[in-house]
Amino acid sequence: CPGHSTVLTGMHPATTGLPANDWVDAKTGQEVYCLAAPQNTLAHGRNTDNGPVGPDQLEVTTLADWLKDQSPQSRVFAVSGKDRGAINLNGHTGDGAYWFTGGFGLTTYVEPGQTAQDRLAPVAAFNTRLVETLKSQPPAWTYAFEDCRALASDWTIRDAAFHSTVPPA
């Protein structure tokens, strides 16, 4: 969050309202995700580790807000691999923030009074094609160099076993 908000607002994280990806709320003692928006839902219908999200905690305007301010009729959408990238770019007035969710395609947040169907309408056809393509042609990672294969290894952190590959398989 602080990186995305800094690049997309031109402001220091101390002034964007997003000083870190997560922090502890001094009033409640609870951990808070930078884009937490408990009143919202996620359009794809499944909760994520981050929970419901939105631009509520972003306290400044972004590139998308500036574009909409200068040209209100313009269509401004933000697409990213992460919610942080999409929401911070889309700001408060952009037309849509979309990010990739495995097994679904592009998703977004839904504010009270909105429907998931309406919020997903701009990307519905893309999502259908994407899911069909991934089912019929699952991505296969190959090693470009044997040096990468040599980096694949097993490792343990706090009694949990992991296996890493380069690129991820």
PLM regions: where:
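His/Asp/Glu-rich, glycine-adjacent segments
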Residues: 11-169
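Acidic helix-start/capping segments at beta-turn-to-alpha-helix junctions
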Residues: 1-6, 84
